[in-house]
């Protein structure tokens, strides 16, 4: 048996080693040097890579309740696997992608909260209910860039979530009530008694939801998709000395959902702990940051089969226990040397998980039991130099080396009544080494104009979920594939940024990505019939398996603009064009097809009007082009346009009230279409009243 705790050992060594260094370091402050070793991109610097920023005030003004909905409305390249909001969507469909680069349940984007990964250790998705907007100070979205400083999970980009700083003693409460029995309440309290500060954030959310099947197709078995969640986040900071600080954080959350019928539910519980030690070296104009974390997840999900008339529902799959755990850490050194900002470091992450599920319903009980899972380890070293050749020219160059391992992979199936073993597969351990890099240039020929370009490579090893766990949506089944190979990216982009004045900004970015061995859900059978793998597929159902597609080429163009017409009125717009096409595949029918779940055109726009100091009116519009539901491009999801609005009144310096309306026009959004034509839909009009008070 392979050592299952390598990352914990690495993290412990890094953390306590850095603690010793910090304790022995000189504490005399020579000068204040603002250098951060957390790998967070500086949006104000002359970086050659794309960055979108959503600050605390923009989060507060947004008409949307959920963070993913806010980002979807403000960043045209942000999307989840499906069009549904995370408010009621199944967690396994909440994988994040940027620039529509191969949406999947696992996602190809790394999401970090204060430098700690939020991606599920087993499946790669992000459960967005664990990061309510009220707990976040800012969001930085960095599409593209390849492996960059972060490696495996950052193939399509990185999203940085930053918690509110512990600056002063304060407390606030926030609550909202809306249609469809939707309620939300949160409490935030911070105590600052230097050199120590501590904070607690607690949030509770509940919605009665809405029916997820198109109105003319619903039957007696259909009911509302519901959601209930809660979160408690505790963190503390200790300023050990003028140059040394320690941050501790612990989080626990629960999420329970009904998926639209009586027999389909899922639940998630999770807990995270982390520690971050930071020490500044003023004489060297440098900073060392060491972090360590542990994560645990427990997931359960049930699936059913429904007859054509939607009058009878039958249990189909019970994933009754899906545990997953992760541990990791990093050590990052950053320093300024003349015209160079240098970042050096290493990180590691260990993940283990398995699925325990009952399947093959015989009319009374599930006949069979399946167990499947495994473990992964990633360890990487990276270096990057940002070189300011002049006030107008910046070059960024870096590389990253990663070592990865897959081990203890297995799949076992037994007859529950007799205990007889039907399948007992042990998958070969695998290892690999990856070397990636990126190079970027930014030039300002004039004060108003900036030009930038970048090339980069990246990779992604399939998640444990993709390798070992099947899933079901209605009568459609997707099988796992333990033989999946890692994906590899070669990408590049060029951009023009024009700031005509302090009140007008326009940027455009053209990009081209080549993804080899892209993991995709490939159709291998149509029901009714019995298939291997997959078993029996009912009429109207489709069997897919996760497989590597040889080559996907994804050209695209992204544009953003901001215009402050007058101090009280501002406009914002964004546009994304993408055309991700399968160029080579083992299955001839896939060649020339667009990737599923990728609209070619997405437009976002917003307007804010502040007629007085107390009143704020905001409106946002989003258009998404048609997209294909399946890999065969045979099922089309219709285009849609949504409008969200908000009216806020600040009745004092401490308090405000807001009316928010999402999907003002009550647009029917097609989120899924099965082989037999059954259409799933997104949320209808959502109206809520929110009150916030600073105590």
Model-identified regions with their sequence ranges:
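Structural signature of Gram-negative outer-membrane beta-barrels, strongest in the C-terminal barrel
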Residues: 241, 293, 339-343, 347, ...
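Flexible loop and strand-edge segments within Gram-negative outer membrane beta-barrel domains
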Residues: 207-213, 223-229, 243-288, 296-324, ...
